[in-house]
Amino acid sequence: MRKFAYCKVVLATSLIWVLLDMFLLLYFSECNKCDEKKERGLPAGDVLEPVQKPHEGPGEMGKPVVIPKEDQEKMKEMFKINQFNLMASEMIALNRSLPDVRLEGCKTKVYPDNLPTTSVVIVFHNEAWSTLLRTVHSVINRSPRHMLEEIVLVDDASERDFLKRPLESYVKKLKVPVHVIRMEQRSGLIRARLKGAAVSKGQVITFLDAHCECTVGWLEPLLARIKHDRKTVVCPIIDVISDDTFEYMAGSDMTYGGFNWKLNFRWYPVPQREMDRRKGDRTLPVRTPTMAGGLFSIDRDYFQEIGTYDAGMDIWGGENLEISFRIWQCGGTLEIVTCSHVGHVFRKATPYTFPGGTGQIINKNNRRLAEVWMDEFKNFFYIISPGVTKVDYGDISSRLGLRHKLQCRPFSWYLENIYPDSQIPRHYFSLGEIRNVETNQCLDNMARKENEKVGIFNCHGMGGNQVFSYTANKEIRTDDLCLDVSKLNGPVTMLKCHHLKGNQLWEYDPVKLTLQHVNSNQCLDKATDEDSQVPSIRDCSGSRSQQWLLRNVTLPEIF
């Protein structure tokens, strides 16, 4: 009997422990689920503290997100909403971990504590919840608190409900002041940024796009350069966040900003002269002729002094070159700080529509910057893009007055001292179409790329792909590509201009109208029956098919 009672006690005790274990297991399991939901960015509860070690989960440490096959169709539909993989973005934590992609020399740099404060201004229009809030969290989690004055979110007339009251409720719970400012009507990036800058309080204004992720140590190097010289405007290295997988890929510290003949921003290799100026130290900032425009920091007072943005420009486009020219020509400095890295989702297409169409807006903006800042070189641009001259570009008197007040240098100074490797040839004999006398067709780059054959097509008189420059170096040039022949009878290809003559040296005879390739001693000829879309090169015969009319343009003296 005693033994039976003892067994009952043991059994009851064991049962209690089993029940207690089950309770604890269920409790912590549910807690983990709560944490997981919170990390994935559901707008409830407080935000997580800065990530100290890599999490486990989709996209952690910047790794790509792979969507299962059964969800591919849904993924494609969701992609159309923002022109990036929204499904992948929503699977990633709002405070995901990222690799430290800085150069080793950057990781040991020490910055003073008394750097200026910054307001981070982020403009958004119908942005995805996950990308917008991931931008905000990355700023908060990876910025020294005493340097981050506030974050200003400027809503450019978004239509999505979750960007209204739910957004305001969410950001109120963050540990840094986050203000949501609303534009009354769709105004575009330029005017929305001006609104954000006007309400900001920091000593420095940092502009970011709404689909960025800041990495460790991103802010201090930017603020340190501005503290060193308040007239220095600084950009981080822009890393790539894949629009397909949200993989985080480090950008290169060996590229800087330039522009092509059509005034489109382009990345080009950092020239040797800039490497020499830095004595080979890649951790030092790169002086860049232009900036991409989406991500940069500027002293708030200096921003006002040099004229903020041109408020006469519409929506987006051209404002980055305009402010770049203005900074350099009016006594400032523009740098890429190689120890600062910020990721950006690069999309292949824009999900937005613009009143009047994108082309019309960009033409107007480019016309304004050309008229105010490019002096006689604006004529070069107008030959490339004659449609620009037909747009109404508004009143520029206040911008011309600003240039006079600031005693800014001419554009020729900018090309000679800041951007001597510009694609714009400063010395040339001819600019325009190159027309074959027999066929009445024109050379055409066909929007082809480096190492592809130059084309020939019916002359259309609209500039663009049919504009070639016969330069003072006797190159036949289209933007940064030159006509090149490496063997007898061709083909005639387009290669990067190397300025070493050789295979890119052409002699034009204004009497015979021939374009003779000096190395091969052959002449440019019309297309052959075998390939009707490319010119040929043959032994010089004096035939009409080897005669070419070059458009000689009378421009103001710029030689």
Swiss-Prot record:
Site (Not glycosylated): residue numbering on this chain: N141
Variant or mutagenesis effect after changing N552Q: Induces decrease in glycosylation
Disordered: annotated segments: 45-65
Catalyzed reactions per annotation: L-seryl-[protein] + UDP-N-acetyl-alpha-D-galactosamine = a 3-O-[N-acetyl-alpha-D-galactosaminyl]-L-seryl-[protein] + UDP + H(+); L-threonyl-[protein] + UDP-N-acetyl-alpha-D-galactosamine = a 3-O-[N-acetyl-alpha-D-galactosaminyl]-L-threonyl-[protein] + UDP + H(+)
Region called Catalytic subdomain B, residue ranges: 285-347
Region entry Catalytic subdomain A, spans: 115-225
Domain (Ricin B-type lectin) ranges: 431-551
Tissues expressing this chain: Colostrum contains a soluble form.
InterPro entries per the UniProt record, alphabetical: GalNAc-T (IPR045885), Glyco_trans_2-like (IPR001173), Nucleotide-diphossugar_trans (IPR029044), Ricin_B-like_lectins (IPR035992), Ricin_B_lectin (IPR000772)
Top-rank lineage group of the source organism: Eukaryota
Record EC number: 2.4.1.41
GO biological process: one example: protein O-linked glycosylation via serine
Gene3D superfamilies assigned: 2.80.10.50, Spore Coat Polysaccharide Biosynthesis Protein SpsA, Chain A
Cofactor needs: Mn(2+)
Domain free text: There are two conserved domains in the glycosyltransferase region: the N-terminal domain (domain A, also called GT1 motif), which is probably involved in manganese coordination and substrate binding and the C-terminal domain (domain B, also called Gal/GalNAc-T motif), which is probably involved in catalytic reaction and UDP-Gal binding.
Protein name: Polypeptide N-acetylgalactosaminyltransferase 1
